[in-house]
From Swiss-Prot:
Domain of life: Eukaryota
GO cellular component, one term: photosystem II reaction center
Name this protein carries in UniProt: Photosystem II reaction center protein L
Lineage: Eukaryota, Viridiplantae, Streptophyta, Coleochaetophyceae, Coleochaetales
NCBIfam families: PRK00753.1
HAMAP family: PSII_PsbL
Family as reported in the entry's similarity comment: Belongs to the PsbL family.
Gene that encodes it: psbL
Biological process, per Gene Ontology: photosynthesis
Transmembrane regions listed in the UniProt entry: 17-37
InterPro entries for this protein: PSII_PsbL, PSII_PsbL_sf
UniProt-annotated location(s): Plastid, Chloroplast thylakoid membrane
Reported function: One of the components of the core complex of photosystem II (PSII). PSII is a light-driven water:plastoquinone oxidoreductase that uses light energy to abstract electrons from H(2)O, generating O(2) and a proton gradient subsequently used for ATP formation. It consists of a core antenna complex that captures photons, and an electron transfer chain that converts photonic excitation into a charge separation. This subunit is found at the monomer-monomer interface and is required for correct PSII assembly and/or dimerization.
Subunit structure: PSII is composed of 1 copy each of membrane proteins PsbA, PsbB, PsbC, PsbD, PsbE, PsbF, PsbH, PsbI, PsbJ, PsbK, PsbL, PsbM, PsbT, PsbX, PsbY, PsbZ, Psb30/Ycf12, at least 3 peripheral proteins of the oxygen-evolving complex and a large number of cofactors. It forms dimeric complexes.
């Protein structure tokens, strides 16, 4: 394997953090909807 490009690495990191952020928002939305509709 060649050494990873730092730019590529930062883009990958941003994509991963964006994915986790969206996942966290989705989970919070589900929890809040369950809380409000009960």
């Amino acid at each position: 394997m060649t050494t990873p490009n730092p730019n590529k690495q930062s883009v990958e990191l941003n994509r991963t953090s964006l994915f986790w952020g969206l996942l966290l928002i989705f989970v919070l939305a589900v929890l809040f909807s369950n809380y409000f509709f009960n």
